[in-house]
C-alpha cells in the first residue's frame, strides 16, 4: 500500500511543476504582449513585472484582465490563445495547491 507521505510528496511535485508551467506561460504572454498589446504592456509594467520592485496593483490589473476575459476582443490569435493558456494554468495550479493543502491536513 502507498503511504500518505508518498502521495503528499507526489502532489507537491505535480503542484510545483504546474506552477512552473504557469509562470513560464505568463512570461511568454508578457513577451508577446509587448508587440500585440503595447498599451496593456505599459499598464501592467511588462518590463518590471517579475522584479522585486514590481507594482502589485499593476500585476492585479493583468489578473483582472485575464479573469474577465477581456482578451476575447483582441485581433491577435496568438495573444488570445496565450491568455487562455495562462488562465487555464492558473486555475489548474490553484486547484492543485488547494488539493495539496487539504491532503496535507488529512494525512
Swiss-Prot record:
TM annotation in the entry:
6-23, 89-106
Sorted keywords for this record are: Cell inner membrane, Cell membrane, Membrane, Transmembrane, Transmembrane helix
Q: How does it sit in the membrane?
A: Multi-pass membrane protein
Give the matching Pfam families. UspB
Q: Which GO terms describe its cellular component?
A: plasma membrane
**Where does this protein chiefly localize?**
membrane
Q: State its location(s).
A: Cell inner membrane
Family in the record: Belongs to the universal stress protein B family.
What name does the UniProt record give this protein?
Universal stress protein B homolog
Q: Species name for this entry?
A: Vibrio atlanticus (strain LGP32)
Amino acid at each position: 500500500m502507498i503511504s500518505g507521505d508518498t502521495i503528499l510528496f507526489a502532489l507537491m511535485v505535480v503542484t510545483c511543476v504546474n506552477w512552473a508551467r504557469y509562470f513560464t506561460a505568463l512570461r511568454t504572454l508578457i513577451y508577446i504582449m509587448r508587440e500585440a498589446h503595447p498599451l496593456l504592456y505599459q499598464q501592467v509594467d511588462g518590463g518590471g513585472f517579475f522584479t522585486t520592485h514590481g507594482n502589485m496593483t499593476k500585476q492585479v490589473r493583468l489578473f483582472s484582465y485575464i479573469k474577465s476575459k477581456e482578451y476575447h476582443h483582441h485581433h491577435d490569435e496568438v495573444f488570445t490563445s496565450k491568455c487562455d493558456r495562462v488562465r487555464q494554468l492558473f486555475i489548474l495550479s490553484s486547484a492543485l495547491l488547494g488539493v495539496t493543502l487539504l491532503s496535507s491536513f488529512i494525512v
